[in-house]
Every structure is written in structure tokens, then in C-alpha cells.
Regions:
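Conserved small/polar residues in nucleotide/adenosyl-binding loops
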Residues: 1-5
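Hydrophobic alpha-helical segments, especially N-terminal targeting/anchoring helices
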Residues: 26, 66, 102, 178, ...
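Core beta-strand elements of the Rossmann-like FAD/NAD(P) dinucleotide-binding domain
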Residues: 28-39, 192-193
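AMP-binding/adenylate-forming core of the ANL superfamily
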Residues: 40-42, 196-197
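Glycine-rich, N-terminal phosphate-binding loop of Rossmann-like dinucleotide-binding domains
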Residues: 44-45, 200
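A conserved FAD-binding loop/helix module that cradles the flavin
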Residues: 49-66, 193, 205-213
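An anion/pyrophosphate-binding glycine-rich loop and adjacent beta-alpha core
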Residues: 62, 68-169
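Structured mid-domain segments that build the active-site/substrate or prosthetic-cofactor binding neighborhood
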Residues: 166-213
Length: 213
């Protein structure tokens, strides 16, 4: 089932570890409604918005209050390319295509073969770190859409200017434990919450381990 944008989920309706519907509130008129459903897929993302703006884990809260355990909630993936004073995070592919990192003074931040966590730490320790994507060469055309978004949101033209960055959480690893079919698992792999499924960042299959692959 799919909930309309004008509705917020309140709680799962369930009996004996089997889902039968969901209660929602209409944010336009304030009316609370119960919707019947044979199956519900929670796919609203993780809880990375708890650190800035974005997903806040409403789906995870629904599952937890229904008695579904959450797994690996301590594992959080960070990105070194969050644009300061926005909720924008630049793709790491920019670094592979030739973008460079610097302090505002002009000093280079040499990341070489560093791991992503090491680059995040480097950015966190730097004084006013910036990313320079002005010299991407033939790859620049692939980033036009990203540059347009940044300019619309910040007024900065990345093809001509550097932009301030910061390390920040961008994805959560943990979530609703699921099996290979996406079913929400209870205390053992042989027991699942009938009719409840999870996908994407709301789920935790164990595939990533402690960080995003």
C-alpha cells in the first residue's frame, strides 16, 4: 500500500504478529483514519535526518512500537562532502573525476588512497574545508545537473567557485531486520511479522556490515 503525501502514519494495526492495516492522520483536515491492508512495505529511509534535515525514521518507529526489533542501529555512514548550511551532499564521484579538497587558505587536503572514514576525519579536522570542482575536464558535462542544483540552492556556481563542505551523516546502516524476501524478522530467522516488509535504508539485511559498501 502507498500512503498519500497528505497523510502521516501513526501506528500499525496488528494482531498476533500479523499486520492488518495502519492508522494515519490527514495533515490537511486533522482526521485520523484506519486503512486496511494485507501487506505494508516500510521504505521511507533511515534516520539520518536526526542529525540534520531529511529522513527521521517514522517507519522504524512504527515497526518498533509494533514489537519488531531493530538491528545495527549504531552503524552510521558519513560523507565528507556535505555542503555547509544546507542539507545537500555531493556525490563522491566528483573526487574520482578530479575534484580536489582544500582548506580555505589554499592548502591541499591530500586523501590519496585514504578510506572514506579517513577522508571524513580529514575534512572534520580541516580549517574551513572546500571542494574545488572547477577543473574536471571532459567529465564536467556529467555533473551539470549537480552544479545546477547547488547554484539554485546556494547561489554558488561550482564550475567557477569552490564550495564549503563538512563531514556529516548521510545514511544509516541499521533498521528493520529482513530476510531475503524483505520480510520483517522477529527474534529468529524462522519467525517473521506476517504482512510487514521493509526495503531500502529502512531495512537491515546485514549486506553492508558496519558501513556502506
Amino acid at each position: 500500500m502507498c500512503i498519500r503525501d497528505s497523510h502521516l502514519p501513526l501506528s500499525l494495526i496488528h494482531t498476533n504478529e500479523s499486520v492488518s492495516g495502519i492508522t494515519v492522520v490527514d495533515i490537511v483536515n486533522g482526521r485520523i483514519t484506519a486503512l486496511q491492508a494485507k501487506a505494508i512495505i516500510i521504505a521511507d529511509g533511515g534516520f539520518e535526518g536526526a542529525f540534520s534535515h531529511g529522513q527521521v525514521g517514522l517507519g522504524l518507529d512504527l515497526a518498533l512500537r509494533a514489537g519488531v526489533p531493530l538491528r545495527d542501529m549504531e552503524f552510521i555512514a558519513h560523507s565528507p562532502l556535505g555542503i555547509k548550511d544546507t542539507n545537500l551532499i555531493l556525490p563522491l564521484g566528483l573526487l574520482h573525476d578530479g575534484a580536489t579538497l582544500h582548506e580555505a587558505s589554499g592548502s591541499d587536503l591530500e586523501f590519496g588512497e585514504s578510506t572514506l572514514d579517513e577522508v571524513c576525519q580529514m575534512v572534520s579536522n580541516a580549517k574551513q574545508p572546500v571542494i574545488d570542482a572547477r577543473n574536471l575536464g571532459d567529465a564536467s558535462g556529467w555533473w551539470n545537473a549537480v552544479f545546477r542544483t547547488v547554484k539554485q540552492r546556494t547561489g554558488i556556481d561550482m564550475s567557477r567557485q569552490t564550495v564549503g563542505i563538512e563531514s556529516r551523516p548521510h545514511a544509516t546502516i541499521g533498521g528493520i531486520t529482513v530476510d531475503e524476501h524483505g520480510r520483517a524478522i522477529l527474534s529468529t530467522w524462522s519467525r517473521w511479522f506476517t504482512g510487514l516488509y521493509a526495503a531500502g535504508d529502512a531495512s537491515c539485511s546485514g549486506f553492508h556490515g558496519a558501513d556502506i559498501l
